Amino acid sequence: MAAVNDMPGPITVLIVVPTLDAGAADVGAVELVRILERTDHRAIVVSRAGRLVADVIAAGGEFVALDVDTKNPLRMLSNAAVLNRLARERGCSVIHALGRSCAWSACIAARLAGIPFVTSWYKGFREQNLFKRLYNSVMARGARVIATSEQLAQLVNDRYGTPWEKIAVVPSCIDFQPFEPGKVTPERIAALRKSWGVQPSTRIILVTGRIVRRKGHHIAVQAAKRLMELGLTDFLCVFVGEDRGHTGYTGDLWDLVLSTGTMDVIRMAAPVGDMPAAYAAADIVVSAAIQPEGVQRAILEASAMARPVVVSDLAAGPDVILTAPAVPESRITGLRFAAGDAAALAAALLRLLSMPEPEAAAMGQRGRAWVLGHFNTSVGTEQILRVYGEIVPRTGQPAVLPRAH
């Protein structure tokens, strides 16, 4: 294995990401810029413009606007030519793609430029047909394939036969400084509760994730219905994600809320700018994903804020949330349920809502200690630089790229 600094000097990484808004890959691109810039390397980010462009620039990266979020083959080829030229002009050592829609252009450009191609997986992808499988397969064609969780690494190996020596597990890592429970003032918490219309005695279940079907908000609604049937009414499920144009699913959710009679315990709130306060206001934080996810930043952030978490078995692996029977009950940092099983989610929520406050607080503190020790930026920096060090040639000559399988 290459050493962390086993590179021929400072390198320039061309990071290609479909958008720079709020998704896991978008935020991951910004964190990658921070890692590179603070270790005396250089980052160039190519993407469609978005709210995180300012963060890229503030972190020391260079931003190049290009609409790489496309499935049009002609546009992909055109983008590949632009990326190839950019990589050659700026002396890039690696092209790193953080999404499928941009990865084909990035892959072609890397081959044209004679430099390594790297991909990062932040979630699993559905493959309804052979065309979809081919489209997704570009994410397994890198000289290194980075998976943000052990679950995703296993998926890449199982689905595409990618050799384990080409797969690197590099979890999303967080700058935890803003997520310090003691730094969140009561006024910030009160302001959020007021904006959500929450009564003082009401307990908050914060449901994370953008409003898209794969995040499982409909499972949370069904679980809320089951809690009501058990006689619980002193809780409120707050959805704080954006729908980003997925109005069809949002409409389906509203229909489900109306048909289940859960209007009084479901709140579809606007996206929150003060997430540390949102976690602090919550009694429980939930991720109900029904498709494989990487290491979700929201779960790491919630754990850092010492909140008990409930996750589906596709939302976070055992490396993120410690649950029984993998660890003794005295060491668990949250609860896990079978993805798509509303009854199991309701049972997990009922257990936490019924738990004595000191016991729930202790669980939250264990979660905080775990994520701060295993998902901090120092760990992420070492891991990502090791990946680059393994593939960037020390001679400075173009790398010999492996043939796609």
PLM ranges: what are they?
Residues 23-31, 203-226, 251, 343:
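A conserved mid-protein helix/loop that constitutes part of the nucleotide-sugar donor-binding site
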Residues 45, 308-311, 316-321:
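Short hydrophobic beta-strand element within catalytic cores of glycosyltransferases
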Residues 45-51, 174, 208, 236-251:
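Glycosyltransferase donor-sugar binding loop
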Residues 97-103, 121:
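Short His-centered aromatic/hydrophobic patch
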Residues 111, 117-147, 154, 161:
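A conserved, positively charged/aromatic
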Residues 151, 173:
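Carbohydrate-associated surface elements
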Residues 250-270:
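Nucleotide-activated donor-binding/catalytic signature segment of Leloir-type glycosyltransferases, i.e.
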Residues 322-342, 351-357:
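Conserved acidic donor-binding segment of nucleotide-sugar-dependent glycosyltransferases
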